Structures are given as C-alpha cells and as structure tokens.
Amino acid sequence: MELKGVHQQNGTSNGTGAAGTEGESPPPAPAPATAEAAASLETTTEKVDAEQQKTERTNWGNGLEFLMSCISVSVGLGNVWRFPFTAYENGGGAFLIPYIIVLFLIGKPMYYLEMIMGQFTSQGTVKIWSVVPGFVGVGYGQAFATICIITYYSSLLALTLFYLFVSFQSVLPWSYCWEEWMNCVDSRPQEDTDALLLSSSNVTNVTALTDTVKLQSSSELYFLNVVIKEKMDISDGIGDPDWKLTLALFVSWVVIFLVIMRGVKSSGKAAYFLALFPYVVLFILLVRAVTLEGARDGIIFFLEPQWGELLNPTVWKNAVVQCFFSLAVGSGPIIMFASYNRFDHGIYRDAMIVTTLDTLTSLLGGITIFAILGNLAHNLQIENIRDVVRSGTGLAFISYPDAISKFQAVPQLFSVLFFFMLFVLGIGSIVALQSTIVTILCDQFKSWKYWKVALATSICGFLMGLVYVTPGGQWILTLVDFYGGTYVVFILAIFELAGIVWIYGMQNFCDDVEFMCNRRVSLYWRVCWSFFTPVMMIVIFIYSMVTIEPITYSEQFFPEAGNVAGWLLFGIGAAQFPLWWMWYISHHREGSLGQSFVASLRPSDKWGPANPETKRQWVIFKNEKAAQRATKKQSSKMGAFWQKLGHFCGSNT
C-alpha cells in the first residue's frame, strides 16, 4: 500500500474510527447508481470537507516554527538555571556520566515517544489517552504538575526582570559591598575598589581575615538582603509580597499572555527569537568566563569525573530528574507542540536535533558557571569549589551577576543582555507550559475561545505566583519543586510509558509510528521503550521513595506543617491517576466490574489520527500488518511441522 500522501487527505466520514479499534476493515461504500448520484455524493463530500476545515486543528506555519518552539522550551531555564546547580550539588564532573547515560536510555526515548503521541493524535496531554482510557488520570496529573512548575518558574522571571531593571544604573548595585554588610568581598575587580561611590569602611579587609571567618561576595549578599529579603525561618509565616517583585511578576505574565494569546500562530513566530537569541548572549558570557582568573579550576571540577559517585543512586536519581526538567518531558509541552504538526511531519529529525542541542547547551551553561565559580573561589581564597556558594535557585542570581561585575568594559550593557537573555529563556519555557494547560482546556471545551482561556489562566498564574515573591518565597519554591513537580512528574511518566508500551502494546505502537513516519522503528527504540527506560525509571523511583529524607532549604529543615503540605501536594498530583481510572470505570460500565476494568485498558473509538480519511487508511494499514503477521506465524508453524516430519521420516529409513 502506498503511504505517501494519504496523511493530508480529507475524509468524508467520522465513523471509521470504531473499526480501527476493533481491528476490522470498514465496509466499502456502495457505488452510486447514476452519474447524478455520483455528482450528489461529490457535493456532499465537498460540504463535509468544508465543515471539517472549520473545525480542523491549527497547524504550525511551517516545520521550522515547531523546531524552534521545541528548542525554546527544552533549551531554557532547565539548562542555564537548573543544570549547573544540580551538577554543583552532585559533585560536578561525577554528574555528567550518569546524566549522559540517562539521556540516551530515558531522555531521548521519552522525548521521541511524546512527540509521536502528540502528532499521531493531534491532541493534547489529556485527550491522547483514548489509547488507554483508564489512564486519563496520567494526563490530568501531569497538568497539575505543570501548573506547579509554572507558578514558580514565573517567580524566576520576576527576579530576572528585577535584575534587568537595576542593570541600567551607572554602577551595578551588586558589584560592591554596602556599609551594613560585614565580611563582604566586592564582586567587581579589586583594582576598582577605590572607585566605590559609597563608603566601604565597614567592609572587612580580605587579608586581615582569619580562617574562621566566612566571606561572602557582594553579589550573594545583594540577592539575599536586597532582592528577596530572605527569611531564615518561616515558622511564623512567609511574609508579604514585595511590591517591586510583584510588579515584575505582573509584567512577566503580561508578556506571556501576549505571546500565547493566538496560539501557535503567535507563539510560533516568537519562537525564532526565543530559541536563537539566548545563544548569542550565552556565548559572549562563556568567552568572558573562561578568561577569568581561577576559571580553569572550576572547569576541571565540572568535567573531571569522580568515579566513586557512579555507585551513588542519588546521583542517578538527580540525573533523571534533571533530564526530565531539561527536556520538558513528562509534563505535556512536547505532546502539545507536536499535536499542532501535520500528520506526516518528520519528527524523528526534530527529536534528535532538540535532544542533542539540549545536552550541548547544558554543557555550555555548566562550563560557563563553573568557570565563574572557579573565579569566585579564587577571590574568596577557598580551595574547595563546592564550598563557594549555596546551591539552589540563587545560584543563577549570584554567580552570573558576579561574573558580569568583573567585565572591564560597560558591565551594565552585558548585564542587560544577560538578564534579558534569561528572561527570554524563561518566557520560552513558560509559554510552552502555559500553552499545555490552555490546550487541555480548549480540547475539552471546544466552544471556549483560546485567547479568553489564555487570559484567565494567566491571571490565575499571576495570583498563584505571589507566594514566591515574599521573603519566605524561596522556601515555598523548594517545597513545590520537590513535592509538586519532581516526584509527581516522575511517577506519572512511569505510568505514561507503561500505558503506551505495555498495555496498548509495543507492536501496535510501532505500527502506528511506521504508518505515520513511513519508516520502521529501530531496535534501539524498541529495547529502550519496552525495557531499559521503564525499568530504570521504576528502580530509581523506588530507591528515591525508600531513601527519601525531609527536605531542607539553606541547610535548615522545614517545619512539620511544611512537610505535611508537601506530601499533600504530592498526593493530589499522584492521586489523579487512580481517581480518574475509577471515574472512567464507573461511567463506562460494560457488564461486570471486571469487564469494565478490561474495557478501560482497550483503545476507545476516538483513538487514532484525527483526520477521518487518514484514520481510514490507518485502519487498512493495521489490518494488513495483522494479516502479514498471521501469515508469517502460520508459515513458521508449517515450516516447523515439515521440518519435524522430515526428521521423523529420515530416522525411520
């Protein structure tokens, strides 16, 4: 059967889907008896096609918009913000080997699988579960985790905008020590110390310090004392939102809404800038970072593997978590973006480009920030780079500003460029996450206007983000990231893979991929999807839950109420899976409870390509593949029979 071209045809009927799920070919339409009847049928077909065009899902303007959009979300805050401090917490170079192994055995397979599911069905994170209707809770749980991630990602945008605004000052405010800061070291070059505009008489001289005094850079003290006004204890509350950060948060959400208000028509055009501009600034910063004194020690710490850490399961767990966040798998954006593709778009190439570029960008960001950390350790006279600065959210807002302060020429210009780049990266990430939620709602409620849903969700995102711009906001961010983002995404990704590969079936899934992409699925993907990826994820998740410890922020434990709230957050996200499964069974009874349970694991009539004609061709293709396998199996049995008969006859002659 010729597959080329059938994917873009428009069908005349919406009733071919049921046959596809039952494995039977639809009966051929009766031929019209007269030319008049044929003309009437043609007219009817044209009307149906015209009606379908009105309700057809919007597509990307071109394939490059899709690729740029995937790059903008996968090459984002996860690379520049999260990857460096995750590597920092896990021994630098020791983290690279597990991360690269995890990328090939979990990251790439999951990324490609989600691209396939979105493009094949032209549906969002929830609607794709017509493949295994009982698993629809996976989609809703991932939506819950996505909302959690959106709320604190937007607070990072607020911090970025704050730094962007103050970068226009004649002297960068974090480059020098303020009078009230003791044991502080200027972030800008020491030869510029005499040029301070403010008195620094209270700043401790580095050479006069004893080994027992801990020095802090002015960039770190500025972030903690001026920007977030950090509370070291939230037992009495988290405080009120800071008005400056609140304003920055509002501006961030206005920009997000403007980008997504027209769906892929607007976000696709913005993707070119969102994907490409950050590389220009990151390369400039890299060139400067590697020329700083002490940068070599930091880069060596980042790249030199510590083989003993390979036996530490925690490092592997963190590698999986980072891979998920960096590639944005398990939370819906990849499925959502791919759902706006043409059915025959070449996603294999795009998946390989994005996952490879994502890794290279993570390495680029890692080298940049560890070069900066090496310089910071040199200036603070600290031998162990691990002890230079606290890891966590503040790393990007401490180490990067510290490096910018050391630029000899117009550091304000580079600061503006850098924080604008960081803002662009954040916009790219949140646009994808926010569009995922909007797509879920618009898929569910067809009559809702896309821009109205985008506006409503943006307002909700702003209101929920206010909690993170309080003095205790970083505590809440740590809590939500750990319980509402990391573990919820992890466990639901396991169910996602199990539902598609183990319940729907590897053979069925590979047939669908072959029909859509017109190429057979290689052994690498089959082995990863069916064995390596799910087994590794299950083992790492079980280990994580067995060895889980109370989380800390700035080396302090959360109050008991915080841990209870965290587990409640995790419970809400994870419970979506069983609760929606029970709901489906109770609302789709087919005989006994056991029969209803089995039915919930079979594809529904809605499963398959969205285009009716493409779906009809898919049904034919599936039936042909099933017939070929049956014939091959029968031939194999007959061959074995004649072989045994030959051996028997030969032994009796």
Curated annotation (Swiss-Prot):
<keyword id="KW-0739">Sodium transport</keyword>
<keyword id="KW-0325">Glycoprotein</keyword>
<feature type="compositionally biased region" description="Low complexity">
    <location>
        <begin position="10"/>
        <end position="24"/>
    </location>
</feature>
<keyword id="KW-0813">Transport</keyword>
<feature type="topological domain" description="Cytoplasmic">
    <location>
        <begin position="1"/>
        <end position="59"/>
    </location>
</feature>
<dbReference type="GO" id="GO:0006814">
    <property type="term" value="P:sodium ion transport"/>
</dbReference>
<keyword id="KW-0029">Amino-acid transport</keyword>
<feature type="region of interest" description="Disordered">
    <location>
        <begin position="1"/>
        <end position="55"/>
    </location>
</feature>
<feature type="transmembrane region" description="Helical; Name=10">
    <location>
        <begin position="459"/>
        <end position="479"/>
    </location>
</feature>
<feature type="transmembrane region" description="Helical; Name=6">
    <location>
        <begin position="270"/>
        <end position="290"/>
    </location>
</feature>
<dbReference type="GO" id="GO:0005886">
    <property type="term" value="C:plasma membrane"/>
</dbReference>
<comment type="function">
    <text>Unusual broad substrate spectrum amino acid:sodium cotransporter that promotes absorption of the D isomers of essential amino acids. Neutral amino acids are the preferred substrates, especially methionine and phenylalanine.</text>
</comment>
<feature type="transmembrane region" description="Helical; Name=12">
    <location>
        <begin position="528"/>
        <end position="548"/>
    </location>
</feature>
<keyword id="KW-0915">Sodium</keyword>
<keyword id="KW-1133">Transmembrane helix</keyword>
<feature type="transmembrane region" description="Helical; Name=4">
    <location>
        <begin position="146"/>
        <end position="166"/>
    </location>
</feature>
<feature type="transmembrane region" description="Helical; Name=3">
    <location>
        <begin position="125"/>
        <end position="145"/>
    </location>
</feature>
<dbReference type="GO" id="GO:0015179">
    <property type="term" value="F:L-amino acid transmembrane transporter activity"/>
</dbReference>
<feature type="transmembrane region" description="Helical; Name=5">
    <location>
        <begin position="241"/>
        <end position="261"/>
    </location>
</feature>
<feature type="transmembrane region" description="Helical; Name=8">
    <location>
        <begin position="353"/>
        <end position="373"/>
    </location>
</feature>
<dbReference type="InterPro" id="IPR037272">
    <property type="entry name" value="SNS_sf"/>
</dbReference>
<comment type="similarity">
    <text>Belongs to the sodium:neurotransmitter symporter (SNF) (TC 2.A.22) family.</text>
</comment>
<feature type="transmembrane region" description="Helical; Name=2">
    <location>
        <begin position="93"/>
        <end position="113"/>
    </location>
</feature>
<keyword id="KW-0812">Transmembrane</keyword>
<feature type="transmembrane region" description="Helical; Name=13">
    <location>
        <begin position="565"/>
        <end position="585"/>
    </location>
</feature>
<protein>
    <recommendedName>
        <fullName>Sodium-dependent nutrient amino acid transporter 1</fullName>
    </recommendedName>
</protein>
<feature type="compositionally biased region" description="Basic and acidic residues">
    <location>
        <begin position="44"/>
        <end position="55"/>
    </location>
</feature>
<dbReference type="GO" id="GO:0042943">
    <property type="term" value="F:D-amino acid transmembrane transporter activity"/>
</dbReference>
<feature type="transmembrane region" description="Helical; Name=1">
    <location>
        <begin position="60"/>
        <end position="80"/>
    </location>
</feature>
<dbReference type="GO" id="GO:0015804">
    <property type="term" value="P:neutral amino acid transport"/>
</dbReference>
<dbReference type="GO" id="GO:0005283">
    <property type="term" value="F:amino acid:sodium symporter activity"/>
</dbReference>
<keyword id="KW-0769">Symport</keyword>
<feature type="glycosylation site" description="N-linked (GlcNAc...) asparagine">
    <location>
        <position position="202"/>
    </location>
</feature>
<keyword id="KW-0406">Ion transport</keyword>
<dbReference type="GO" id="GO:0042940">
    <property type="term" value="P:D-amino acid transport"/>
</dbReference>
<dbReference type="GO" id="GO:0015175">
    <property type="term" value="F:neutral L-amino acid transmembrane transporter activity"/>
</dbReference>
<dbReference type="Pfam" id="PF00209">
    <property type="entry name" value="SNF"/>
</dbReference>
<dbReference type="GO" id="GO:0089718">
    <property type="term" value="P:amino acid import across plasma membrane"/>
</dbReference>
<dbReference type="InterPro" id="IPR000175">
    <property type="entry name" value="Na/ntran_symport"/>
</dbReference>
<keyword id="KW-0472">Membrane</keyword>
<feature type="glycosylation site" description="N-linked (GlcNAc...) asparagine">
    <location>
        <position position="205"/>
    </location>
</feature>
<feature type="transmembrane region" description="Helical; Name=9">
    <location>
        <begin position="413"/>
        <end position="433"/>
    </location>
</feature>
